[in-house]
């Protein structure tokens, strides 16, 4: 029943808000109005983890990000996330990531951070609300031009997957891949959103990719099971919908944007598609950015001068700036 999905999602939000405090199961169950027994039982059923292990992994992962991004003392970070001592924190960190906090701070490397669990989706929301798609309010899809500089793409390519759902159903571990990429978020190509999905073409067949865009001169570690490929500079047509309510309108927004992207004629703007060696990218950050599909293009000789001046009423986005 979707009611339990929603309740467990509320539990997850409650945990996220209290990672740096000392709440108890009783505190949470009282706040949410369910018994401790049902909280633990339903949480495990929907996430595949015990509450205790989930909280432990989320705390150690949040602490890892603070080690990477702040100058706070290791002891202070340990205490903040409810470890009894720096030694206890070190033991936990080694157990989770096979290296000490001090070693990680000196040389951050890709590690499998535990990501926030999500069990209440737009599907469950619409079961609850019984909203028909015609009642959903969405905005017009914008078309913009953006130049992305040469970069590297680190991730996973799967020719057997056609979309996001296919990708995770085809044996890729969402928690492991997303958590590892999250640990590399500080390396994201400036102006990009971090974890990026998209499509590639191989022998006339379309596959799906998932990873992160990093600087062209990146020479650091490549996570096990992932590849690193060089991507040249290119202009992209960006089919964009501004921020929206993920639970309420995600399906309709994605459908509209993708319909526009896959059916658009770039010659109207003096372009042609350039997907032979480049990839289509997908940006999905509903509340903070919105949703966009980016398709690489190259200018046509006969209209290159006009395009360079930003004709045809299409917005020109500067080098490496997102369209948010």
Show where each model-derived region lies:
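Short, charge-enriched, intrinsically disordered boundary segments that mark the beginning
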Residues: 1-9
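Terminal helix-turn-helix DNA-binding modules in bacterial transcription factors
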Residues: 9, 13-26, 45-81, 107-130
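The alpha-helix within a helix-turn-helix
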Residues: 29, 78, 90
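Short coil turns linking two alpha-helices in DNA-binding domains
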Residues: 33-36, 84-86
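A solvent-exposed interaction/effector surface
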Residues: 61, 87, 95-99, 109-324
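A short, basic/aromatic helix-end/turn motif that makes direct DNA contacts
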Residues: 80-84, 94
């Amino acid at each position: 029943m979707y009611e339990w999905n929603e309740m467990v999602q509320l539990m997850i939000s409650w945990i996220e808000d209290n990672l740096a405090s000392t709440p108890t199961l009783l505190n949470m169950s009282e706040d949410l109005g369910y018994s401790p027994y049902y909280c633990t039982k339903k949480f495990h059923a929907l996430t595949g983890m015990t509450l205790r292990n989930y909280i432990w992994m989320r705390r150690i992962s949040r602490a890892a990000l603070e080690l990477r991004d702040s100058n706070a003392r290791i002891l202070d970070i340990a205490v903040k996330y409810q470890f009894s001592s720096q030694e206890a924190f070190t033991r936990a960190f080694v157990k989770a990531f096979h290296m000490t906090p001090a070693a990680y701070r000196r040389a951050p490397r890709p590690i499998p951070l535990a990501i926030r669990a999500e069990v209440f989706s737009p599907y469950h929301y619409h079961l609850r609300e019984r909203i028909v798609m015609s009642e959903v309010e969405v905005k017009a899809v914008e078309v913009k031009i953006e130049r992305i500089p040469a970069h590297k793409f680190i991730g996973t390519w799967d020719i057997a997957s056609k979309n996001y759902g296919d990708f995770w159903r085809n044996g890729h571990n969402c928690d492991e891949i997303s958590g590892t990429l999250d640990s590399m978020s500080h390396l994201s190509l400036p102006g990009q959103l971090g974890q990026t999905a998209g499509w590639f073409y191989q022998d006339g067949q379309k596959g799906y990719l998932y990873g992160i865009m990093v600087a062209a001169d990146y020479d650091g570690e490549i996570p096990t099971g992932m590849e690193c490929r060089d991507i040249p500079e290119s202009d992209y047509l960006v089919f964009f919908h501004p921020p929206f309510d993920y639970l309420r309108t995600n399906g309709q927004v994605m459908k509209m944007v993708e319909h526009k992207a896959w059916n658009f004629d770039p010659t109207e703007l003096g372009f042609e598609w350039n997907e032979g060696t480049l990839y289509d990218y997908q940006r999905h950050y509903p509340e903070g950015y919105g949703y966009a599909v980016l398709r690489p293009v190259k200018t046509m000789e006969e209209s290159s001068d006009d395009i360079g001046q930003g004709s045809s009423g299409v917005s020109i986005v500067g080098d490496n700036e997102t369209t948010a």
